């Protein structure tokens, strides 16, 4: 019979399993032409994303005045191509988003309406 110390072998097996799982951990990467958020923007998870005409049916009439004022201040009145994001919440590191992930420049009404957004896809 062969008697030998199995502790080093068990250690190497456990170490290789841990290294395999660490290497297989998914990373959050921007894809689809988007980029990660710039320092002046914030990462949000939003229910409705689009131009003013696309998201206007989802805007509460009481919030509409603030949205238009923010758009006018952002681009001098030419806001047809600016992307808006509605009903947004912040995303923490390791968090998930079941709606559209965006990076937004301006936040109006504490995240309810976001102006100057860029949609990104997170892997």
Curated annotation (Swiss-Prot):
Disulfide bonds: 37-103, 45-97, 46-88, 104-117
UniProt main location, coarse: secreted
Location of the protein in the cell: Secreted; Secreted, Cell wall
GO cellular component: extracellular region; fungal-type cell wall; membrane
Family matches, as Pfam families: Hydrophobin
Entry GO MF terms: structural constituent of cell wall
Keywords for this protein: Cell wall, Disulfide bond, Secreted, Signal
InterPro entries per the UniProt record, alphabetical: Hydrophobin (IPR001338)
Stretch forming the signal peptide: 1-24
Summary of the function given for this chain in its UniProt record: Aerial growth, conidiation, and dispersal of filamentous fungi in the environment rely upon a capability of their secreting small amphipathic proteins called hydrophobins (HPBs) with low sequence identity. Class I can self-assemble into an outermost layer of rodlet bundles on aerial cell surfaces, conferring cellular hydrophobicity that supports fungal growth, development and dispersal; whereas Class II form highly ordered films at water-air interfaces through intermolecular interactions but contribute nothing to the rodlet structure.
Sequence similarity: Belongs to the fungal hydrophobin family.
Subunit structure: Self-assembles to form functional amyloid fibrils called rodlets. Self-assembly into fibrillar rodlets occurs spontaneously at hydrophobic:hydrophilic interfaces and the rodlets further associate laterally to form amphipathic monolayers.
Protein's recorded name: Unclassified hydrophobin 9
Species of origin: Pleurotus ostreatus (strain PC15) (Oyster mushroom)
Gene that this sequence comes from: Hydph9
């Amino acid at each position: 019979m062969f008697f030998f110390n199995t502790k080093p072998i068990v250690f190497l097996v456990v170490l290789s399993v841990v290294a395999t799982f660490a290497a297989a951990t998914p990373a959050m990467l921007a894809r689809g032409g988007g980029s990660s958020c710039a320092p002046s923007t914030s990462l949000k998870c939003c229910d409705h994303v689009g131009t003013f005409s696309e998201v206007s049916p989802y805007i509460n009439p009481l919030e509409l005045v603030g949205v238009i004022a923010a758009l006018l201040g952002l681009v001098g009145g030419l806001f047809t191509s600016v992307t808006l994001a509605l009903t947004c919440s912040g995303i923490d590191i390791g968090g998930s988003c079941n709606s559209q992930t965006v990076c937004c420049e301006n936040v109006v009404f504490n995240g309810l309406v976001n102006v100057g957004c860029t949609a990104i896809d997170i892997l």
